[in-house]
Amino acid sequence: MTTPALLPLSGRRIPPLNLGPPSFPHHRATLRLSEKFILLLILSAFITLCFGAFFFLPDSSKHKRFDLGLEDVLIPHVDAGKGAKNPGVFLIHGPDEHRHREEEERLRNKIRADHEKALEEAKEKLRKSREEIRAEIQTEKNKVAQAMKTKETRVLPPVPVPQRVGVSGGDPEDMEIKKKRDKIKEMMKHAWDNYRTYGWGHNELRPIARKGHSTNIFGSSQMGATIVDALDTLYIMGLHDEFMDGQRWIEENLDFSVNSEVSVFEVNIRFIGGLLAAYYLSGEEIFKTKAVQLAEKLLPAFNTPTGIPWAMVNLKSGVGRNWGWASAGSSILAEFGTLHMEFVHLSYLTGDLTYYNKVMHIRKLLQKMERPNGLYPNYLNPRTGRWGQYHTSVGGLGDSFYEYLLKAWLMSDKTDHEARRMYDDAVEAIEKHLIKKSRGGLVFIGEWKNGHLERKMGHLACFAGGMFALGADGSRKDKAGHYLELGAEIARTCHESYDRTALKLGPESFKFDGAVEAVAVRQAEKYYILRPEVIETYWYLWRFTHDPRYRQWGWEAALAIEKSCRVSGGFSGVKDVYAPTPVHDDVQQSFFLAETLKYLYLLFSGDDLLPLDHWVFNTEAHPLPVLRLANSTLSGNPAVR
């Protein structure tokens, strides 16, 4: 309603109202103009309200048959005379009229009874005290907790365990090589003992500050990442007292029912991989049990529209999300593509194909997708199933996806031909578009970004030299020699990246622009955080060629780590490998014990220690046995040689 029509206009006169005799004799007999206006305003508003209410009232004909809405809904209304033989006779259901009315009445009574029961239950709830409500909630929580505990302590089905071939030994005959191996073992002892003293139970160690350290990939909880990551290294080095200390901590303290958001990828390769390796090496059931408990906590991460898992998951709530920086909320190729080895072993050990089906679904989805230039972009949106920005790398964000294609084939005793085919296709595309030779003759692997090649190689990509050597046997067109040579060229390039620094340690990434070759240009790329990839490649090439240069290069790296990274409280990364005096970052990474020192130890050991025809190393250097299955089911009987 608009108000201007009710307001007095200039020049308009309002006739006096005859209001009858005054209620109170002592009042004036006449009213002022303003008082008359107020009365007129009130009267106008009252009349408007009455007329408005009349027009806005609902049509009463809509409610002639209200009665809970049952008669018109449950028994259709029939107008008089429609279909009737005699006018004036009402037929609702013909001869069954009484039966239907009885059914209607019973249904109406049931609905009323249910309604009254629900009201009574609600009243009863409201009558309860806060203490009673809290007690009921706690009872329900206890039931859920007990169910979880029962699930966690259930006995896993017995399965034949592959033979523990070459889990110890490997003593070199050459005394000089043995001295070098003993030195690596001493470095491991120094790293472990200081973690044991200053960071026990924490994820990692700050060796200069001498206290625990953690990053967001492990969440907010103290999950003992270094303990789990280092167990298999301790075992193969024969440090059994230290191994038992770690086992006791895991039995008594490792708990996954914590409100902590963790990286699915990192927890899989470090924790599940580490626990599975410790189980296969030692035979201790606690490691298998813990691995399965943790794996169940990761499964909610796969609850996405496409089945591509989130990067992060809360271990308690199961809520997942992706990294905010990852191309419009995409999942990362190297993360969701680096689950296959561990999940296949989980299905084998439990008889539960859920894990196997999760990773096979990822593979099938990737096979169907169009790949620009045959390359896999680093980003995939888990909601839409579409690629993010077209950035392809064999280094960070992409690396271990290609590694796991090859290792899925090797771990299956070379029967997973689909994985091998995908690996071969990918390597051919990488050779065509990413691998180049610099003016100085150094072979490097660049990165493809939005249609052009960036002539930069990361330290993480240096693992590829070992991958090419590992995949040489079984390659297409009898190109084994070619890929072994390609691996050697990558190893030489990565060695140059070490040799061209003041500390003889490699930078995080290095360029090949003009006169600049195998050298970091930006300050943010000059750090070394105890990474293993170059030494990993040396070890694989040593195993396949026994060329002494790889042991020599590995020893150079070990001496550089000892000189520039060793501190009284452990080992630390350095911020600038080109500065002659090291500035430490004060972090002893868990992968230094899991990978770097393990690969150095194996480099100076005999080939009978963890032979490659029986063991396949996951991307965190945790050895998992080849599964030689007698039939197509993962939980079937393996034909172990």
UniProtKB/Swiss-Prot annotation:
Name of a matching Pfam family: Glyco_hydro_47
Reactions that this protein is recorded to catalyse: N(4)-(alpha-D-Man-(1->2)-alpha-D-Man-(1->2)-alpha-D-Man-(1->3)-[alpha-D-Man-(1->2)-alpha-D-Man-(1->3)-[alpha-D-Man-(1->2)-alpha-D-Man-(1->6)]-alpha-D-Man-(1->6)]-beta-D-Man-(1->4)-beta-D-GlcNAc-(1->4)-beta-D-GlcNAc)-L-asparaginyl-[protein] (N-glucan mannose isomer 9A1,2,3B1,2,3) + 4 H2O = N(4)-(alpha-D-Man-(1->3)-[alpha-D-Man-(1->3)-[alpha-D-Man-(1->6)]-alpha-D-Man-(1->6)]-beta-D-Man-(1->4)-beta-D-GlcNAc-(1->4)-beta-D-GlcNAc)-L-asparaginyl-[protein] (N-glucan mannose isomer 5A1,2) + 4 beta-D-mannose; N(4)-(alpha-D-Man-(1->2)-alpha-D-Man-(1->2)-alpha-D-Man-(1->3)-[alpha-D-Man-(1->3)-[alpha-D-Man-(1->2)-alpha-D-Man-(1->6)]-alpha-D-Man-(1->6)]-beta-D-Man-(1->4)-beta-D-GlcNAc-(1->4)-beta-D-GlcNAc)-L-asparaginyl-[protein] (N-glucan mannose isomer 8A1,2,3B1,3) + 3 H2O = N(4)-(alpha-D-Man-(1->3)-[alpha-D-Man-(1->3)-[alpha-D-Man-(1->6)]-alpha-D-Man-(1->6)]-beta-D-Man-(1->4)-beta-D-GlcNAc-(1->4)-beta-D-GlcNAc)-L-asparaginyl-[protein] (N-glucan mannose isomer 5A1,2) + 3 beta-D-mannose
Enzyme Commission number: 3.2.1.113
Principal place of residence: Golgi
Similarity section: Belongs to the glycosyl hydrolase 47 family.
Residue ranges crossing the lipid bilayer per the database entry: 37-57
Protein name, as recorded: Mannosyl-oligosaccharide 1,2-alpha-mannosidase IB
Residue(s) carrying N-acetylthreonine: T2
Source organism superkingdom: Eukaryota
Cytoplasmic side: 2-36
Alphabetical keyword list: Acetylation, Calcium, Disulfide bond, Glycoprotein, Glycosidase, Golgi apparatus, Hydrolase, Membrane, Metal-binding, Signal-anchor, Transmembrane, Transmembrane helix
GO molecular function: calcium ion binding; mannosyl-oligosaccharide 1,2-alpha-mannosidase activity
Cellular compartment(s): Golgi apparatus membrane
GO cellular component entries: Golgi membrane
Chain positions carrying an annotated carbohydrate: N631
Organism per entry: Mus musculus
Annotated pathway: Protein modification; protein glycosylation
Active site: E508 (proton donor)
Membrane-related topology note: Single-pass type II membrane protein
Job of this protein: Involved in the maturation of Asn-linked oligosaccharides. Progressively trim alpha-1,2-linked mannose residues from Man(9)GlcNAc(2) to produce Man(5)GlcNAc(2).
Lumenal side: 58-641
Disulfide bridge positions per record: C462-C494
GO aspect biological process, one term: lung alveolus development
Regulation: Inhibited by both 1-deoxymannojirimycin and kifunensine.
Residues annotated to bind Ca(2+): T619
Cofactor(s), by name: Ca(2+)
